């Protein structure tokens, strides 16, 4: 009843609860915009389209709660229904400084499997490996160059957050399993080159990846230099 006059309803709950919550939204006004902000899109969009006959859009803000404004922040959008009805919402995000990046739900979930799932899974595996190897974290910090310190920061910050959040992201899509298996296969493939001492194969692979990155490799190198300078200024230990 509290939503009977709503113009916009945004579902912002943990991934594992999203579908259940959406299924309760059966009495929204026809003109109400129904949206979600979860990090997977195909399943929520399907549920929203099924429960609500009005305008539907999937949103994925590519930033966390520490961000204080929308300037230069990316919001991915996935059309569900009636984009002309929710156009004003996206325009308002633009007014606040956000960059709107529209894709289909399948494109979104495929990209997130690489951008989020693989990155989180690799980071968790690396942290788990450091722990099981009995690494001295204080010593690693003291002996790290700026770039490796930054990598340790990225690992450590993940383990300072809610494990359920990352578990939900990794476990949300069964297709992620195949992606992680392919990653493990390529890891072992490169390990085999190291084991047999095939440096030529390793260098060939390296150059192939460098060619694939193209101009982005140099762009990322320069961006990382600026980030490292900033990180060094903020260093507390």
Predicted regions and their residues:
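Rossmann-fold NAD(P) dinucleotide-binding segment
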Residues: 1-48
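Short secondary-structure transition/capping segments
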Residues: 6-8, 69-70, 112-116
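A general structural signal for well-ordered alpha-helical segments in protein cores
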Residues: 6, 18, 86, 180, ...
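Alpha-helix boundary/capping residues
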Residues: 9, 25, 96, 115-118
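Rossmann-fold dinucleotide-binding core
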Residues: 40-103, 109
